Amino acid sequence: MVSFRTMWSLVVVVVVVAASLGSSGVHGRSVEGSSRMERLLSSGSSSSEPLSFLSQDQSVNKRQVFDQACKGIYDRAIFKKLDRVCEDCYNLYRKPYVATTCRQNCYANSVFRQCLDDLLLIDVVDEYISGVQTVGK
């Protein structure tokens, strides 16, 4: 009988806590960041279709670390580090066009900077920007 009362008390506590969290308006960071990312991606595109940039004559490989369009110094470690930001940003938003847009123009774009912000890498932004300048044009 004691274990039944303990279980019932535990269920009541869980329901009360869940109800108080649901009504307090707690939102995850990705909800806010997702809307910012959507606005950022839609503002740079002339088309309303989010994947319209994939129809260009260049095929995009999500797993490709080295971008042949980058005319700067080839450094595999820097490319992996920059690519990791885009990969983590993709994992945060789960939108394929976030990953591909993040890599455009040798990582020198506003989506890459937004990803640095959303991944809370603000304290090392200069290090990443230096890497972008090294591999960039």
UniProtKB/Swiss-Prot annotation:
Signal peptide positions (record): 1-28
Keyword Disulfide bond included in the entry's annotation: yes
Covalent S-S links between cysteines: C70-C106, C86-C102, C89-C115
Subcellular location: Secreted
One of the GO biological process terms: circadian rhythm
A GO CC term assigned to this protein in UniProt: extracellular region
Any Pfam family matching the protein: Crust_neurohorm
SUPFAM superfamilies per record: Crustacean CHH/MIH/GIH neurohormone
Modified residues (D-phenylalanine): F66
Domain of life where this protein originates: Eukaryota
GO molecular function list: neuropeptide hormone activity
PROSITE patterns, alphabetized: CHH_MIH_GIH
Tissue-specific expression: Produced by the medulla terminalis X-organ in the eyestalks and transported to the sinus gland where they are stored and released.
First-listed, main subcellular location of the protein, grouped into a coarse class: secreted
Function of the protein: Hormone found in the sinus gland of isopods and decapods which controls the blood sugar level. Has a secretagogue action over the amylase released from the midgut gland. May act as a stress hormone and may be involved in the control of molting and reproduction.
Family note: Belongs to the arthropod CHH/MIH/GIH/VIH hormone family.
Listed name of the protein: Crustacean hyperglycemic hormones
Lineage: Eukaryota, Metazoa, Ecdysozoa, Arthropoda, Crustacea
